[in-house]
Amino acid sequence: MFVPSGDSVPDLAGCTLLMPAVSVGNVGQLAIDLIISTLNMHKIGYFYTDCLVPMVGNNPYATAEENSAELSINAEVYALPSKKLVALQLRSIFIKYKSKSFCEKLLSWVKCSGCAKVVVLSSSHSYHRNDLQLRSTPFRYLLTPSMQKSVQNKIQSLNWEEMEKTPCIPEIDDSEFCVRVPGGGITKLLYDEGCSKEIPIAILLKFVSEGDNIPDALGLVEYLNEWLQIIKPHCEDPTASSLPWKMPSSWRLLFGSGLPPALF
């Protein structure tokens, strides 16, 4: 599944894998874009898979004309060895009935590569919130049992709110309660697979609506940064402006190109 860019397979033992779920507003994918661009992570390989819709494009993180013509595809892996970080970016949707196969192959690769933990950045439909969720923060987290053992104390110290269980079948009053992530794509599937296969997975998500989701992505990476300290503020002043996340060059065309002057 994983094809390295170089001649040798990179050593990912002990690394933290960051990845998005293709979810409402593409918030997770935008957040991974911010992380890769800000940390200037380099590409170490890609996933050769029939589970995603084929896609090819220019380098989304181009910083100069020299590297703008590099090609990118639907599933690529980036790394920053100095911080033991690996990022998987997904750029297309799943082919019908292929998402479970992808999750199984992905987690098998995670185990074989020796990654210490997986952090999934996701989102969920804001209109599915209940009254309690409407009155609280829009951010939530989920931890698989094997992840809870190692990070539960740290997470609790941040005063984060865990994703609440809701009726499995909302229309039935006495329905059993379970974890549901409406609009979350493979989020729930990854969580269930991680629980059954004892893989340490943390899911961080935000309740959002479709639209300009750049502010949601910025909020999600800052939420992640509270825990992992990917980048640190320049000063200790808590009232200082937000952290210097770098938007990739490809975001200039996030909503398409400008209107042609000939229209006027």
UniProtKB/Swiss-Prot annotation:
Residues found modified as Phosphothreonine: 137
Subcellular location: Nucleus
Alphabetical UniProt keywords: Chaperone, Nucleus, Phosphoprotein
InterPro entries: Proteasome_assmbl_chaperone_2 (IPR019151), Proteasome_assmbl_chp_2_euk (IPR016562), PSMG2_sf (IPR038389)
Record has Chaperone as a keyword: yes
Main location, first listed in the record: nucleus
Keyword Phosphoprotein listed: yes
GO biological process terms on file: chaperone-mediated protein complex assembly; proteasome assembly
GO cellular component: cytosol; nucleus
PTM per Swiss-Prot/TrEMBL: Degraded by the proteasome upon completion of 20S proteasome maturation.
Superkingdom classification of source: Eukaryota
Entry-linked Pfam families: PAC2
Subunit-level organization: Forms a heterodimer with PSMG1. The PSMG1-PSMG2 heterodimer interacts directly with the PSMA5 and PSMA7 proteasome alpha subunits.
Alphabetized PANTHER family for the sequence: PROTEASOME ASSEMBLY CHAPERONE 2
Functional description taken from the UniProt entry: Chaperone protein which promotes assembly of the 20S proteasome as part of a heterodimer with PSMG1. The PSMG1-PSMG2 heterodimer binds to the PSMA5 and PSMA7 proteasome subunits, promotes assembly of the proteasome alpha subunits into the heteroheptameric alpha ring and prevents alpha ring dimerization.
Family of the protein in this entry: Belongs to the PSMG2 family.
Protein name: Proteasome assembly chaperone 2
